[in-house]
């Protein structure tokens, strides 16, 4: 019995350290995610540009973009989690039924739907608060995103009056875009523990830029509403 007590005393610190190590490892998780987004913009402008804004509001419409990337989560305590990610983002909006001319010398007139695309590398920094923490878990997310501008492009679907159709890709580079933009990110999420290490998450998220797309007479602030789906694994 004495030997058993002595062995227990000797091994107690080792077991404690091992348990602490396991607990520390279980606080980290890493995952991949993808979010299809309903994307658009708000405009801020002086009163004397109202007529230009009215023209834009008639011809511009929301469009679909996406975010995709990886994220690392750290469980601070039972209900609070910090999340850091890196994502590729496509923000968009669209001009519909724009009157255009032909290409390559074709003078036939027609109509075009033109999608404008803005590409970013985004670094979201979030705090997740778990309101339910069982096999199914729910949480509220809030934070900021640091967005680095990459490039812009357009895709046009043209229909000419003679019935011909054409799809044209182009890079504009017309505006002097703000290279680094900070945005707000917020939403709610629902998760499910598939196993001890794996969980699936579905997160409706709202993203809003705090700075305009470019320095221009009419300031454009991009935003999106999406449903992010992610698979995470505890390390």
Question: PLM features: what roles do these ranges have?
Answer:
Residues 175-177, 181, 189-235:
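Predominantly the C-terminal beta-signal and adjacent terminal strand-loop region
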Residues 79-82, 135-136, 197-200:
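Repeated loop/turn-to-beta-strand initiation elements of outer-membrane beta-barrel proteins
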């Amino acid at each position: 019995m004495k030997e058993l007590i002595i062995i227990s005393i000797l091994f107690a610190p080792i077991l404690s350290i091992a348990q602490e190590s396991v607990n520390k490892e279980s606080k980290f998780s890493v995952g991949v995610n993808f979010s299809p987004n309903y994307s658009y913009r708000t405009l801020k402008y002086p009163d004397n540009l109202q007529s230009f804004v009215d023209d834009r509001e008639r011809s511009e419409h929301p469009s679909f973009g996406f975010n995709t990337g990886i994220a690392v989560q750290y469980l601070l305590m039972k209900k609070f989690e910090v999340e850091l990610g890196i994502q590729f983002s496509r923000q968009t909006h669209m001009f519909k039924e724009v009157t255009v001319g032909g290409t390559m010398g074709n003078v036939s007139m027609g109509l075009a739907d033109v999608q404008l695309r803005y590409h970013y590398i985004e670094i979201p920094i979030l705090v997740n608060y778990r309101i339910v923490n069982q096999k199914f878990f729910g949480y509220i997310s809030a934070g900021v995103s640091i967005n680095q501008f990459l490039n812009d492009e357009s895709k046009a679907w043209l229909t000419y009056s003679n019935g011909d159709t054409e799809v044209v890709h182009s890079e504009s580079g017309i505006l002097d875009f703000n290279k680094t933009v900070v945005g707000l990110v917020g939403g709610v999420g629902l998760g499910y523990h598939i196993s001890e290490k794996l969980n699936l998450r579905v997160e409706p998220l709202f993203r809003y830029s705090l700075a305009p797309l470019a320095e221009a007479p009419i300031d454009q602030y991009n935003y999106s509403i999406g449903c992010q789906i992610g698979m995470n694994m505890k390390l």
